[in-house]
UniProtKB/Swiss-Prot annotation:
Pathway in which the depicted protein is active: Cofactor biosynthesis; biotin biosynthesis; 7,8-diaminononanoate from 8-amino-7-oxononanoate (SAM route): step 1/1
EC assignment: 2.6.1.62
Family note: Belongs to the class-III pyridoxal-phosphate-dependent aminotransferase family. BioA subfamily.
Protein name as catalogued: Adenosylmethionine-8-amino-7-oxononanoate aminotransferase
Gene source species: Synechococcus elongatus (strain ATCC 33912 / PCC 7942 / FACHB-805)
Functional summary from the UniProt entry: Catalyzes the transfer of the alpha-amino group from S-adenosyl-L-methionine (SAM) to 7-keto-8-aminopelargonic acid (KAPA) to form 7,8-diaminopelargonic acid (DAPA). It is the only aminotransferase known to utilize SAM as an amino donor. Complements a bioU deletion in Synechocystis PCC 6803.
Subunit structure: Homodimer.
Any one Gene Ontology cellular component term annotated for this protein: cytoplasm
Enzyme class: transferase
Cofactor(s) needed by this chain: pyridoxal 5'-phosphate
GO biological process: biotin biosynthetic process
């Protein structure tokens, strides 16, 4: 049981969990513990850190902004960091995404997108309210986000309170998968059937990679077929890029790598480089225009106390600048992982290896499987003993490190993982 008398930790079994490791500092890809040990942050501290901890350029941007304007209400007021961030983002986003709405985290970015999609149809006086999502999806822990996520132990206590969503098969794939085309065909057939009635408001998907659902990967071809069907049905496509955005898939955004154009996109995690909580939902001008009629009923009545926080915006601007400077590194992420993952894939305890950009994953052979598989905790503990921060999703082992990690360091991590798999 965690020893602190007042803290309550997320996603942690209160009775069974070992004491948390106390971190005193971070620099680059490394974290320093209170006892002096160092860990390589192989998962970007829950997928948020892009450039490494304590990156001076982001530190200075936050400090300068804090000395100028730390926060101001964003209703009826604006400020330069928000305006500049919106302009810079729209230069790199899929071209039709032009209207930026700020909130606080990935869950709220999804909530905003769902509300925008549903109110879009309300504003048009068209009775569309059906939402389609995918098996294995995870979109966050607030009620709307839970509703569009797979029913699981994460949301089981609240299931009766979640709104109705239709879930479609997700054609996950991996290296050597000979059934992927059949799975995609079945998934598209299910999409077509669900869209046939013409009353679907929106379809939401994590493009290319489902994160917390197990780093389940899909091919661009499937996304392209999906987007075409959704567009033909007149429905809206919501891309949840909370995890995949800002280079994680080897492109600025997974939508761009997949060659699709969403109507709404949800961004967070890497938005500020991992320094501060901030999220953004970006909509097309077509959606935005339905909120501009002058009818008070068409106003988007949604906001947060820290909407468009200037410190977060300043951090995000600095992070975008760093991404522009390291674009070649982002484009080379997949090549950097490839040798190590190919070697790891030969291990007898590894199955279903898969790779998209800088997101590498595999399943560990286990009798149980699933999020509560105890093999995950054994891997975590063995990794810490080797100076690595890993947090498997049950029997799903993955790497999602910050971009500052060198290819040599990455190969050393793969070798250490192979070594620990020999022992657990």
């Amino acid at each position: 049981m965690p020893s602190h008398p007042h803290l309550w930790f997320p996603f942690t079994s209160v009775k069974d969990a070992p004491d948390p490791l106390k971190v005193v500092s971070g620099k680059g890809a490394r974290l320093t513990l209170a006892d002096g040990r160092e860990l390589i942050d192989c998962i970007s501290s829950w997928w948020v850190n892009l450039h490494g901890h304590a990156h001076l350029r982001i530190v200075e941007a936050i400090a300068q902004q804090a000395a100028t304007l730390e926060h101001v209400i964003f209703a009826g007021f604006s400020h330069e960091p928000a305006e500049r961030l919106a302009m810079e983002l729209c230069k790199i986003l899929p071209e039709k995404l032009t209207r930026v709405f700020f909130s606080d985290n990935g869950s709220t970015a999804v909530e905003v997108a769902l509300k925008m999609a549903l109110q879009y149809w309300h504003n048009l006086d068209q009775p569309r309210s059906r939402i389609l999502a995918f098996d294995g999806a995870y979109h966050g822990d607030t009620f709307g986000a839970m509703s569009v996520g797979e029913r699981s132990l994460f949301n089981a206590p609240f299931e009766k309170l979640l709104f109705s969503v239709e879930f479609l098969p997700y054609p996950e794939t991996w290296w050597g998968d000979e059934t992927v085309e059949a799975k995609e065909a079945a998934a598209i057939a299910a999409v077509e059937q669900a869209l046939a009635a013409g009353d679907v408001a929106a379809v939401i998907i994590e493009p290319l990679v489902q994160g917390a659902g197990g780093m389940r990967m899909a091919r661009p071809q499937f996304l392209q077929q999906l987007a075409a069907r959704v567009q033909a049905a007149g429905s809206l496509l919501i891309a949840d890029e909370v995890m995949t955005g800002f280079g994680r898939t080897g492109a600025w955004f997974a939508c761009q790598r997949a060659g699709i154009q969403p109507d709404l996109i949800c961004l967070s995690k890497g938005l500020t480089g991992g320094f501060l909580p901030l999220s953004i939902t970006v909509a097309t001008e077509v959606i935005y225009d339905t909120f501009c009629s002058g009818n008070p009923d068409h106003t988007f009545y949604h906001g947060h106390s820290y909407t468009a926080n200037p410190l977060g915006c300043a951090a995000a601007i600095a992070s975008l600048e760093l991404l522009l400077d390291s674009e070649a590194i982002v484009q080379g992420l997949e090549d950097a992982h490839l040798p190590g993952l190919e070697l790891l894939a030969q291990h007898p305890k590894v199955t279903r290896p898969r790779l998209t950009g800088g997101i590498a994953a595999c399943d560990l052979v286990s009798d149980r499987g699933g999020y509560l598989d105890p093999i995950g905790l054994r891997v975590r503990q063995a990794a810490i003993a080797r100076g690595l921060l890993l947090r498997p999703l049950g029997n799903v082992l993955y790497l999602l490190p910050p971009y500052c990690l060198t290819p040599t360091e990455l190969q050393d991590i793969y070798a250490a993982i192979a070594d620990l798999l020999d022992e657990i």
